[in-house]
Amino acid sequence: MRFFDSFSPKLALRIVLSILSLVLLFHLTVMVGIVPYKIVWGSKLHSINQMLVYEWITILITAIIFLIFLIKAKLVKTFLPLAIVNFLLWIVFVFYSINTLVILTSGTSVEKAVFTFLSFLMALSSYRLAKEKSFVSWR
């Protein structure tokens, strides 16, 4: 656990904001057909309509998670107390921890190679920020 304590909140915040930006961009490229939808979701998607539903849900969830981190960084003003923001970050930590395990069992090597590492970084960074007892400056 010492590593987590030396992992700065500012670095964790920069990591999550960068990764989430890239994830949003990636899913948008899947939606518009630049990246073939057959290589995502463990190759389980069978139609463009199915892909669009999955991608819209993913983009919505990612945007909500992005917003939580923006609130933690005080880049978005909110009425939510810090305790609620931190609770939401613990939920994000659990989500990305489970997501990391799910990706490891997915069907495609591309997902395993790239997204396992990114998901693990998100879990690690979420953990670090959830432990932080104050809002975090990203600068």
PLM feature segments, named:
Residues 75-89:
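Loop-to-transmembrane helix junctions at the membrane interface
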